[in-house]
C-alpha cells in the first residue's frame, strides 16, 4: 500500500488496503479496455547486443533526446526529496506519521492538478523552454522545502514540486516519442525508463549520503541549487532544445 495513504491508515486502519485494491482494479480494467492497435509491419528482428545497444546509440546521437533525458537525470539525482520525508516529518516539522502521510500525498496532488490543467491546454509553444523552466521551478521548490520549518510552507513547496515534475515529465515523454522514429521508439523509451527509474533511486541515495555529511536540510537545499544551476547550463548546452517552437515541429 502506497505511503501516500498514510493519513487514511491513521483513521481507517486495514480498510485502507481496500482503497488501494479498488484503485488497482480500476487501473487493470482501464488497461484491458484499451483497443488493439496491431503490431505495425509485423517484422521481427533477432535480438542481439547491437540491437539492445542501438537505443543508447540513438539517444547519444540525437541532441534533443539526449538533452531531454539527461536533464531528467539531473533533476531526480539532485532534487529527490521523497525518501527524506520521514526525517522532515519527525525531526523538523514534528508532525508524526499522519503528517508524513500528508507530506507524501501533497506532490501527488500537485501532479494531479498539473495533469488536469495540461489536459485542457492546446499544443505547447516552445516545449523545450517550458521543460527547462519547469525543472528550474522544481529545483526552487526543493530549496524552499529544505528551508521551511512551517508545515503550510512545506506543503505549498511540495505541491509545486509535484506539479512542476508532472509538467516536465509530460513534456519529456512527448518530446522523446515525437522525435524518435517508429522503428526505434520502443528501444529509446526503454532507455528512458531505465534512466528514470535509476535516477530516482540514485537521487535518494545521494540525498541520504549528503545528509549524513552536512545535515538533511543543507543536503536537500544544495541539491535544489544544483538542479537550478544545471538547468541553466543545459539551456546553453542544448540550444536545439530551446529553439523548438511547437510540438508539431518535433516529428518533421
Tell me the role of every PLM-derived stretch.
Residues 1-252:
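Alpha-helical transmembrane-bundle signature of multi-pass membrane transport and export proteins
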Amino acid at each position: 500500500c502506497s505511503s501516500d495513504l498514510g493519513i487514511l491508515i491513521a483513521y481507517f486502519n486495514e480498510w485502507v488496503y481496500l482503497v488501494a485494491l479498488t484503485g488497482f482494479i480500476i487501473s487493470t480494467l482501464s488497461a484491458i479496455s484499451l483497443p488493439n492497435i496491431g503490431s505495425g509491419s509485423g517484422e521481427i528482428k533477432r535480438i542481439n547486443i547491437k540491437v539492445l545497444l542501438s537505443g543508447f546509440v540513438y539517444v547519444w546521437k540525437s541532441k534533443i533526446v539526449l538533452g531531454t533525458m539527461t536533464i531528467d537525470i539531473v533533476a531526480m539525482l539532485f532534487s529527490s526529496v521523497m525518501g527524506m520525508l520521514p526525517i522532515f516529518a519527525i525531526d523538523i516539522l514534528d508532525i508524526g506519521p499522519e503528517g508524513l502521510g500528508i507530506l507524501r500525498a501533497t506532490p501527488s496532488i500537485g501532479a494531479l492538478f498539473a495533469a488536469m490543467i495540461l489536459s485542457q491546454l492546446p499544443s505547447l509553444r516552445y516545449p523545450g523552454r517550458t521543460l527547462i523552466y519547469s525543472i528550474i521551478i522544481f529545483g526552487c521548490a526543493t530549496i524552499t522545502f529544505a528551508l521551511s520549518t512551517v508545515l503550510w510552507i512545506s506543503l505549498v513547496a511540495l505541491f509545486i514540486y509535484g506539479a512542476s515534475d508532472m509538467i516536465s515529465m509530460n513534456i519529456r515523454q512527448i518530446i522523446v516519442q515525437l522525435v524518435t522514429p517508429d522503428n526505434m521508439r520502443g528501444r529509446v523509451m526503454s532507455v528512458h525508463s531505465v534512466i528514470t527509474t535509476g535516477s530516482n533511486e540514485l537521487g535518494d541515495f545521494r540525498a541520504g549520503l549528503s545528509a549524513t555529511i552536512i545535515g538533511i536540510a543543507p543536503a536537500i537545499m544544495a541539491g535544489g541549487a544544483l538542479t537550478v544551476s544545471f538547468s541553466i547550463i543545459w539551456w546553453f548546452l542544448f540550444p536545439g532544445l530551446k529553439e523548438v517552437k511547437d510540438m508539431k515541429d518535433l516529428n518533421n
